[in-house]
Amino acid sequence: MATFKEHLQERSAHSIGRVNAHGYEDSNFLLTKLTENKMSCPMTISMLAPTLGTVGRINEESRTRRNAGYPINFEFDFGPVIEFLNMRLNNAGDPFMECNYGIHSKKFEIAVLDWFARLWELPKDQYWGYVTSGGTEGNMHGLLVGRELFPEGIIYTSCDSHYSIFKAAKMYRVQCIKIDTLFSGEMDYADFRRKLLQNTRSPAIVNVNIGTTMKGAVDDLDEVVMILENCGFANRFYIHCDSALVGLMMPFIKQAPKLTFKKPIGSICISGHKFIGCPIPCGVLITRLMDINHVMSTNIEYISSNDTTIAGSRNGHAPIFLWYALKRIGYNGLCKTVENCLKNAQYLALRLREMGVSVFLNALSITVVFERPNDETFVRKWQLACQGKIAHVVVMPNVSLERINMFLEEFTKSRIALHQDKCVAGDVSQENCLCSLHLDRKKEAV
């Protein structure tokens, strides 16, 4: 029986174009044709190799080692599946439908989707989903389904939401109401209730953050549902959960609130290149099949598939990498990894506080928020994500205790050299601010 790889090779061989003995398009042939073009750049492989080698060394030795501000997991080794990059995989159209283009990885994609549907407790015959290009596309799709179900609806989302939520509202020309947040980054539920009551005639399309971008705050899904029902929106709301980073972690944290389709939510999306560490930017969206069948089931004859996704042509390599990562680490591995990240985040927050740095860490979060360093060279060196007066470190699996201690040592030297004393009470609360003003007030209170 032919393997999946052999099956793809056979399909590739029947595609129009020149193929080699392995069934792949001949890259040397393509390169020759490219360089024969008089308008092409006269660069040879020998000229290109040193440049690529230098870039690779820089990325590996300095960038990768000191990436602290952005949630990327560098721990996974995808060597065993790298050779699939030689294949021209395109998961065009609906993942559950065979399309006319036969070189795809939809079987892997469905396996990944099944895994997440089980994780979030949506039965196999009731879910639909696909592997997206990332969290932004997942948010765009979730909100689009909400808009199609409730054309007159208003989008409600907190001020701390990812910028893609506001982008989607603008693209779809849907009114978007921003909800105030607490200093923690969590939605201000009193403000949410107040703004709902000002617009009772229009259905509510609500984005619930399961881990905000800057502070890792988790909105209370149960509280949001209760407020919607108490304000007269029963059966007139759609909830999308932006779970880019934390959505994969929460099911493995015993004390965490449950993220499940047993609650009245419409869709959940995560990023595949963050906690899982897929080397290709991607994501996963899971939603309810009945909603897709109701609002997004137009058939496209050209590809012999339904138009249910945002993108037409979709990356066929990402599902293979996601499948491999999930199979390799497993449920037990994810439990241990999540637990270790939480412990390391608490360690970093404690050490920063001992250094006299204003710091804040949400419960059950791996995003450590602290005063923005004045040294921009240090910020760039550690690739810190900054916003106003604050910065953060996202303690991913590759951010080990060794790297945390290295970061702390360099940050200490930087602060001493620049005599940093910054008030960030407005961002982390007076209780967590350790500037000279608030330290003096605390001493006076004692």
UniProtKB/Swiss-Prot annotation:
Coiled coil: none annotated. Its EC number is 4.1.1.-. GO terms for biological process: carboxylic acid metabolic process. One of its GO terms (molecular function) is pyridoxal phosphate binding. Substrate binds at residue 162. It catalyses: L-serine + H(+) = ethanolamine + CO2. Pfam families: Pyridoxal_deC. The modification N6-(pyridoxal phosphate)lysine is found at residue 274. Its cofactor is pyridoxal 5'-phosphate. Keywords: Decarboxylase, Lyase, Pyridoxal phosphate. It is an enzyme of class 4 (lyase). Disulfide bonds: none annotated. Transmembrane segments: none annotated. InterPro entries: Group_II_Decarboxylase (IPR051151), PyrdxlP-dep_de-COase (IPR002129), PyrdxlP-dep_Trfase (IPR015424), PyrdxlP-dep_Trfase_major (IPR015421), PyrdxlP-dep_Trfase_small (IPR015422), Pyridoxal-P_BS (IPR021115). Belongs to the group II decarboxylase family. Catalyzes the biosynthesis of ethanolamine from serine. Decarboxylation of free serine is the major source of ethanolamine production in plants and ethanolamine metabolism is crucial for the synthesis of choline, phosphatidylethanolamine (PE) and phosphatidylcholine (PC), and thus for plant growth. This is Serine decarboxylase 3. It comes from Oryza sativa subsp. japonica.
